[in-house]
Design a protein with these regions (language model features):
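Extracytoplasmic
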Residues: 41, 45, 115-253
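Solvent-exposed, non-transmembrane loop/terminal regulatory segments of multi-pass membrane proteins
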Residues: 17-63, 69, 115-138
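Signature of alpha-helical transmembrane segments and their immediate interfacial
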Residues: 1-22
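A common structural microfeature
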Residues: 2, 17, 50-54, 85, ...
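Solvent-exposed, membrane-proximal periplasmic/extracellular interface segments of envelope transport
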Residues: 61-137
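Short, hydrophobic beta-strand segments
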Residues: 52-61, 105-111, 146-154, 195-198
């Protein structure tokens, strides 16, 4: 009897497991009315989306050499060409302020970067390492490791839906008297918006999985030349979901 009961429960669980979906978005982790999340999203609207990855690159050769900088340039271009990547910022994009040596009044008209043939790489190395703007952000203290920021494309529809949801929630929470018809309409709109947001989250989750995989494949091409690591919120969320999905498959069989 006990074995029959266990078998029945296993069958029921297995049927429901196929419909189980994981949501790694912030919506699944906080309440709809969370003020901190709202403030965070308002900052994103003002200053831009914060979806990005960080690539650290430590070449086997001298970082500030023409060969290493050429490899970084190639990697940067390869990453830019990946669908889903909006832009890439690297040490090559960092302006060199005092190469060649000019007066402070002329600095703005003479900004160059490491790709400029007039720049002395040895002097540029010292300037970048000792620049508080760059230090421990795009360059390590010892000048051997640099970082690249891979900015991911946002989803305009998602942002619009989030804003619409906040507007509805504010109306429902306001002290302004609302008719039953208006309340029902707002609640219906809210339900439709939440459904669409969930759909987008699922689509984005699958897309990010493929995106992270393609970025890793691109980085693998350069691993013979350097020690490379990938990090960032999107990668962590994607990897966590894959670990959980793997556990569900194992424990669900």
């Amino acid at each position: 009897l006990i074995l029959l009961l266990v078998f029945t429960l296993t069958i029921i669980t297995s049927v429901g497991l196929s419909n189980f979906k994981l949501d790694a978005s912030s919506d699944a982790l906080v309440l709809e009315s969370d003020e901190s999340l709202k403030t965070y999203r308002e900052a994103e609207d003002e200053f831009g989306d914060s979806s990005f990855l960080i690539v650290t690159y430590e070449p086997k050769n001298e970082l500030f050499s023409e060969y290493s900088l050429k490899k970084i340039s190639q990697l940067e271009n390869d990453l830019k060409n990946i669908d889903g990547v909006d832009s890439v910022l690297s040490i090559l994009d960092a302006p060199i302020f005092f190469q060649p040596r000019v007066g402070l009044s002329e600095v703005s008209d003479n900004l160059k970067n490491l790709t400029d043939p007039e720049v002395d790489l040895n002097l540029a190395k010292e300037e970048i390492i000792n620049n508080p703007i760059y230090k421990e952000l795009i360059i390590s203290n010892d000048g051997k490791t640099t970082a690249m920021q891979v900015v991911l494309k946002g989803n305009k529809e998602y942002s619009q839906l989030i804003n619409s949801r906040y507007e509805i929630l504010e109306k429902l929470d306001s002290r302004e008297p609302l008719t039953s018809k208006t309340i029902n309409q707002l609640q219906n709109d809210l339900e439709n918006i939440n459904t669409r947001i969930s759909e987008i989250n699922n689509q984005e989750s699958e897309f990010n999985k493929l995106l992270i995989a393609e970025i890793r494949q691109t980085l693998d091409i350069y691993r013979d030349e350097a020690t490379i690591y990938l990090g960032g919120p999107s990668m962590i969320a994607t990897d966590m979901m894959e670990y959980i999905e793997s556990d569900l498959v194992i424990f669900g069989t």
